[in-house]
Amino acid sequence: MPDGKLFIGGEWETGTGEEIVSIFPADGSINCSLYGASKNDVLRAVKLAKSAQSQPSWRSLKPHERARYLYAIADGIEANIDRISQIQTRDTGKTLRETAILASSASGTFRYFGALLESSDDLLTAQRNDSLTMSVYEPLGLVSAITPWNSPIASDAQKIAPALAAGNAVLLKPSSWSPLVSLELAKIIESSGLPKGLFSV
């Protein structure tokens, strides 16, 4: 099981919020307990994310260069499907077969958005008369992703991958009923080399 620390601004730390107890739904046994994020933890994560996202090294990164990070995350999920499946089963009570499918789906989501970045073509309407036609792609900045308890890793991927692909930073708030697989995903995202501060749980 993950050690129950939060991932804020690229660092693992104990949250200063309320205690969260992760329970295995099949028998009611306790997986672990951890402390959630307090308001101050969240405000600090927001500040770090905004700072990281505004850095030219991320904000101005070419789409195909951002794709490398998404592929690395997809590879990390695939390499750890058994562990992710076990954690998600303990967290949600789903079968190992189902959680393996969800983990594989999450990997596919990151891979899809990576491929999209490498193959995106500008869709421009035909220029008329003396007009100027252009497409401008700008990140929004910071995306807050709130995901449900029942399919955490697949839901996480569906929010995180497009946000990172567009050049944003992401703050993930998983359900307090099933936070463990999201923390495991944070380890994979950290090992992908994604610049510090762009992702927090």
Describe the function of each predicted region.
Residues 21, 33, 87, 98, ...:
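Conserved beta-strand positions that form and line the central face of beta-propeller blades
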Residues 16, 42, 81, 99, ...:
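Alpha-helix N-cap/helix-start motif
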Residues 31-120:
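Glycine-rich loop-to-alpha-helix module at the N-terminal edge of alpha/beta enzyme cores
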Residues 1-34, 65-72, 120-146:
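Terminal low-complexity tails and localization/encapsulation signals of metabolic enzymes
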